[in-house]
Curated annotation (Swiss-Prot):
GO cellular component: cytosol; small ribosomal subunit
SUPFAM superfamilies registered for this protein in UniProt: S13-like H2TH domain
Protein source organism: Bacteroides thetaiotaomicron (strain ATCC 29148 / DSM 2079 / JCM 5827 / CCUG 10774 / NCTC 10582 / VPI-5482 / E50)
Tagged with keyword S-adenosyl-L-methionine: no
Keywords: Ribonucleoprotein, Ribosomal protein, RNA-binding, rRNA-binding, tRNA-binding
Residue span of region Disordered: 98-126
Name of the protein this chain belongs to: Small ribosomal subunit protein uS13
Gene name in the database record: rpsM
NCBIfam families registered for this protein in UniProt: uS13_bact (TIGR03631)
InterPro entries: Rbsml_uS13_C (IPR027437), Ribosomal_uS13 (IPR001892), Ribosomal_uS13-like_H2TH (IPR010979), Ribosomal_uS13_bac-type (IPR019980), Ribosomal_uS13_CS (IPR018269)
């Protein structure tokens, strides 16, 4: 039986600490804290969890962590706020350039997208 936490099916054959990282917003350190609070061994595989353990983990995540859709929407709202107030970071987001001060002369391809080839100027004939 697949264990479903906040809309994500956890992989059955992985350790609990790793499996919880499949939820957006939970990393290794957060998953270790969650399992400690729930009293579940972090080396125990997900398929060996009892229903009570899974319910306790669900309860902890629901009460203390912002994950999945809520977290994604909060991040989007933060970026939208930056764009609306017109600050430097917001402008960089709006025009699709790196936000954190990286150089754009040669690199920044991830942010800028594929190269857009520009035609050369034709030489003037004498």
């Amino acid at each position: 039986m697949a264990i479903r936490i906040v809309g994500v099916d956890l992989p059955q054959n992985k350790r609990g600490e790793i499996a919880l990282t499949y939820v957006y917003g939970i990393g290794r350190s957060s998953s270790a804290k969650i399992l400690d609070k729930a009293g579940v061994d972090k080396d125990l595989k997900v398929k060996d969890w009892t229903d009570d353990q899974a319910a306790k983990i669900r309860e902890i995540i629901g009460a203390e962590y912002k994950v999945e859709g809520d977290l994604r929407s909060e991040i989007q709202l933060n970026i939208k706020r930056l764009m609306d107030i017109g600050c430097y970071r917001g402008v960089r987001h709006r025009i699709g350039l790196p936000v954190r001060g990286q150089s754009t002369k040669n690199n920044a391809r991830t942010r800028k997208g594929r190269k857009k080839t520009v035609a050369n100027k034709k030489k003037a004939t004498k």
